[in-house]
UniProtKB/Swiss-Prot annotation:
Regions crossing the membrane: none
SUPFAM superfamilies noted in UniProt: Isocitrate/Isopropylmalate dehydrogenase-like (SSF53659)
Pfam family membership, one: FA_synthesis
Species the sequence originates in: Lactococcus lactis subsp. cremoris (strain SK11)
Taxonomy of the source species: Bacteria, Bacillati, Bacillota, Bacilli, Lactobacillales
This protein's pathway: Lipid metabolism; phospholipid metabolism
Protein name: Phosphate acyltransferase
Family: Belongs to the PlsX family.
Disulfide feature: none
Reactions catalysed, as given in the entry: a fatty acyl-[ACP] + phosphate = an acyl phosphate + holo-[ACP]
Main subcellular localisation: cytoplasm
GO cellular component: cytoplasm
Length: 331
């Protein structure tokens, strides 16, 4: 099992990327990690080179680069070389914390989408109060979607939740402005009608955004514009909430500060619950092989989690199962 890694992509590359590999190596003994980038810089942070392949590259795609232009002009970039390795079957999957647009473009151009998948989608596992989490897609790979795109997303998300996260008959829901079947845009209503008739998916109907963090569904489907907005709202709310709690305690009386010390451990647990470090990266589902995007400011723990996520994707052969599913639909 080989995972190609863009070692130069991300705000803290290559340090956090390589340190994340060091952590993942301790648990993933059957994986060879291919690190693409500046070999000298990569070796500064490696514990050792066991199960490591370092592939020298001379270019880096910047967050400000135009994705399509960069893929075409920077062919020796760490990101393009890593994705190309998957295309050539020199690696089984790819991970990058670099430019989202460039990774999605490279994935589509080089790895290719599964036949009959109308649109691949960006999907991530987000936290819930019960610790179970839920998968939401699309998170921004597409800004506009048809009902049939949403139906494909539901299939992709359901397969992922069942095979990678081990959820039996995952509950699939559509984001809408009300839980009633009559609520939603024409696109959502059409998707609702199609999904309701599908026996292979455990479709439970509509879900409102206020119920997401309560664990009302295992897979949540929406268009890319809405999904991206919800994702950023969740991230922002969690950050502000923790900051305001801390500020209120520090600005309070001596009694308040003592109370703050007493609740420090529970608050730490809440922070861990809302953290995405252990959830892995965002998977670009609908492609012929796993392509995973880690957050640009990922910690070494987040990188290790993303690598373990990819390992589960490969071990369960979720991409292969999706290829067969959509091939059968075409018959």
């Amino acid at each position: 099992m080989k995972i190609a890694i863009d070692a130069m992509g991300g705000d803290f590359a290559p340090e956090n990327i390589v340190k994340g590999v060091n952590l993942a190596k301790k648990e993933l003994s059957d994986v060879t990690f291919q690190l693409y980038g500046d070999g000298a810089k990569i070796r500064q942070f490696l514990d050792d080179e066991t199960a490591i392949e370092i592939i020298e590259t001379t270019e880096v795609i910047d967050f400000h680069d135009d994705p399509v232009a960069a893929i075409k002009s920077k062919k020796d970039s760490s990101l393009v070389r890593a994705v190309t390795a998957v295309k050539k079957r020199e690696a089984d999957a790819v991970l990058s914390a670099g430019s989202t647009g460039a990774l999605l473009t490279a994935g589509l151009m080089l790895v290719k989408r599964i036949k009959q998948v109308s649109r691949p989608a960006l999907m991530s596992t987000l936290p819930t109060a019960d610790g179970r989490g839920f998968d939401m897609l699309d998170l921004g790979a597409n800004t506009e979607n048809t009902a049939h795109h949403l139906v494909d997303f539901a299939i992709l998300g359901s397969y992922y939740a069942e095979n990678v996260r081990g959820i039996e008959k995952p509950r699939v829901a559509l984001i809408s402005n009300g839980s009633e079947e009559s609520k939603g845009s024409p696109t959502v209503k059409e998707a609702h009608e199609i999904l309701s008739a599908m026996t292979e998916i455990n479709f439970i109907g509509n879900i409102e955004s206020r119920d997401l963090l309560s664990g009302g569904a295992d897979v949540v489907v929406t268009d890319g514009f809405t999904g991206n907005a919800i994702l950023k709202a969740i991230e922002g709310t969690a950050t502000v909430l923790m900051k305001e709690i801390k500020s209120a305690i520090m600005a309070g009386s001596v009694t308040t500060k003592i109370g703050g010390v007493l609740i420090k451990k529970p608050l730490s647990g809440l922070k861990d619950l809302m953290s995405t470090d252990g959830a892995g990266g965002a998977a670009f589902v609908g492609l012929k092989a796993p392509v995973v995007k880690a957050h640009g400011n990922s910690s070494e723990l987040a990188i290790a989690s993303a690598l373990k996520q990819i390992h589960k994707m490969l071990e369960s052969d979720v991409s292969g199962k999706l290829v067969k599913h959509f091939e059968n639909m075409d018959k």
